[in-house]
Amino acid sequence: SRCRGYKKCVEQCPYKKPMFRGTTRISEKCIACYPRIEGLDPLTEGDQMETRCMAACVGKIRLQGLVKIGSNGEWAHDPDNPQYYLIRDRKVALPLYPQLGTEPNGYYVPSRHVPRAYSQQMFGPGVDHSIDQYMVPDRDLLGVLQLFRTTQRIIFKWKREPGPKIFETNIHGKKFEMYNDTVIGFNRKGKEIIRVTVEEPFYVRPEEHPGAI
């Protein structure tokens, strides 16, 4: 009838969502910072924000968002949404253990440095396709990847503005061309919330303030 703090749910959950709180001696589940997700946090001025754990990630490796759901309960076709584009359109981000059929809300871009057989066990047969795509990304895919960890606000739509060609090489026998495109992210209301370029800009510190940023 109540949690007794055996922590079995913590051991069994593949996503490690339940957390054991020592002060109350019960297991509690992550609530996904729902006031921030729903735009109810008074500090966010109505903008829907990522969870705190996403915002605290120091690496540019996480992207959180919301997708449209159709009348049939499935994801509505929306390639302008960065999550839909990466997961359903390009199939670069994959679900964990797809053979279990749980369809999680967490998707992962498999690493090319991990043994391929191990990645296939975790993410299924789409691993080769995913790695092949982001190893030699086209302009759209490279643009969307620039949006990772650029803002705490949830991006509902993205757009790429063409830029000049800045680099060209061959990767595993495939031609790769890089363009300094500008990628723009928009919130649910269509307002621009982030604008980044593919090439990271250089900032020159003035001589009179050598320690300034």
PLM feature segments, named:
Residues 1-27, 32, 39-72, 84-86, ...:
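Iron-sulfur cluster-binding cysteine motifs and their immediate structural context
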Residues 54-213:
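Long, compositionally biased charged/polar accessory segments in the mid-to-C-terminal portions
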